[in-house]
Amino acid sequence: MNVLILCTGNSCRSPMAQGFLQSFNENINVYSGGTAPAAQVNAKAVEVMKEVGIDISLHVPTHVNEYLCQEWDYVITVCGGAHKSCPIFTGNVHHHLHIGFD
């Protein structure tokens, strides 16, 4: 199963969601991206995830365009900005979900 999680900066919400989802099932391919990626992952996000035993310190914010041509079982937006401005994934996405953490 391929899952893409999107937010605006790909520095906090989507990498955290990626870390959690990947920790639930290592057989799921989980990726995350942003519509306007930050320069680096948010230090507080790394700290909070470390508290629950999940390491996202090596995450590199990635632009959503890197994933446009791939097939996805789920594309999940986790902030209103990404939900409104993320590109259309016609034909390559089986399910779209919006779970806002604004």
What positions do the PLM features span?
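Conserved active-site segments centered on acidic
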Residues: 1-65
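Phosphate-binding/catalytic loops
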Residues: 83-102
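Alpha-helix C-terminal capping/helix-to-coil transition sites in glycosyltransferase folds
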Residues: 69-71
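Structural signal for conserved beta-strand scaffold positions within catalytic alpha/beta enzyme cores
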Residues: 32, 77, 97-100
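Short, hydrophobic beta-strand segments that form beta-sheet elements in well-ordered domains
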Residues: 73-79
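Short glycine-rich anion-binding loops that position phosphate/pyrophosphate groups of nucleotides
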Residues: 11, 80-83
